[in-house]
Amino acid sequence: MKIVAIARDKCFSPHSVENDYAILQAVVEGLQQPIVWVAEEQVRIAGLPPADLYLTMARSAAVLQQLAEAEKAGKRVVNAAESVAQCVRSVLHRVLQAHAIPLPPTEGNAGYWLKRGDASAQEQGDVVFCRDKEALAMQQQLFVQRGVTDWVVEAHLPGDLLKFYGVAGGFFQYFYPSDDGISKFGDEQRNGLAHHYAFDATQLQTMVEQVAALTGVEVYGGDVIVAPSGEFFLIDFNDWPSFSRCRETAAKAIVAWVKHNYLNETK
């Protein structure tokens, strides 16, 4: 079986280039198969190398289109092109609303988050905290000046910020960013140090796996806010994150999933 691994373009890996590369490398090494490496930009320019299975972290529309065509031709892709497209924020937001996934409200008294809706965050200005409605309107004008007219607005929710990581087949882990200080843009500081409010972790995993099923994503991660009451609200969901907090165990889970479902191996 011919396998190609597609490394994510730098523009889709803000402050995470090395970590994104590291998780894909760990999976490639774990599979112990001859695998061709290719950069997302190279695929965009020169096209997909021939393969039976693509392990891809690509997010650009041009590459996703090529992967979708490969799938139509019977090739296998992890994560599938359509599933990655479903993770575009505004698309995902509509899907989650339609299926009653707990999301932050659009109104609140603790500020707002303005989030670019037509793509995943590529720079700090794509997700902006606004202290009130006036600041929100100003930031929306700045978005328009940048050519961004598709966005999502969510009320800021006080509570514990929690990051989760998952792989189809049952792997699920979560962490509190304030416990280890790891941050991409520093936005986590808005929620301060975690209080470690009690919540139902099994219920959280069930909800996250429902989101994964709705999108079709097999390798995923995201963020929730856990309120003092124990309720949680999904604020982000991404295809194939860096798994920087649990890379080794996550890579093993991805390898096991790929072997069992795509290489017809169970060892």
Regions found by a protein language model. Name each.
Residues 1-5:
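Extreme N-terminal starter segment of soluble prokaryotic enzymes
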Residues 51-55, 115, 164-166, 230-245:
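A short beta-strand motif that forms the metal-chelation/ATP-contact edge
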Residues 112-142:
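Conserved anion/nucleotide-ligand pocket segment
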Residues 130-215:
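Phosphate-binding site of ATP-dependent enzymes
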